[in-house]
């Protein structure tokens, strides 16, 4: 374990006890820089259980930070693992699914599946965007996920058949 990883590991209990949404960004930077598996697992576990006020807003902002690109899949997975309400941000997840990697697309699909409520107008716009993106995507795996996300949203509007 590097000295930096040991320092991060030592600071985690204090963040866990007294942390608020402002702790999220430093945790993400620590995760991006951590090389030790134990440190990475501990930070990821803390993120997946985050319940602090404004956590969703802080995580959404972190998606646009270039230095945090290596941990974007973890950021995306945090939304659904922590059960954060992101109903007003469907466009962010659809945009990330379309522009991102296949792994990011998978995490966005999981967020969409796990969020119980999405605004109807956002759903309708997203269905069109996903349909167009799937037609233009070269990666067949990602195409399948984009179409699956489209299907999930269509089902929310009562347009598609239920899938299992």
Question: Each PLM stretch: what is its role?
Answer:
Residues 3-4, 35-36, 67-68, 100-101, ...:
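Short inter-helical turns and helix N-cap capping residues of alpha-solenoid HEAT/ARM repeat scaffolds
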Residues 6-19, 29-30, 38-52, 61, ...:
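Structural detector for internal amphipathic alpha-helices that build alpha-solenoid repeat scaffolds
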Residues 26-28, 58-62, 90-95, 123-131:
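Buried hydrophobic core positions in alpha-solenoid tandem helical repeats
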Residues 95-101, 113-134:
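TPR/TPR-like (Sel1-like) alpha-helical repeat modules
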Residues 161-164:
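Eukaryotic intrinsically disordered, low-complexity regulatory tails and linkers enriched
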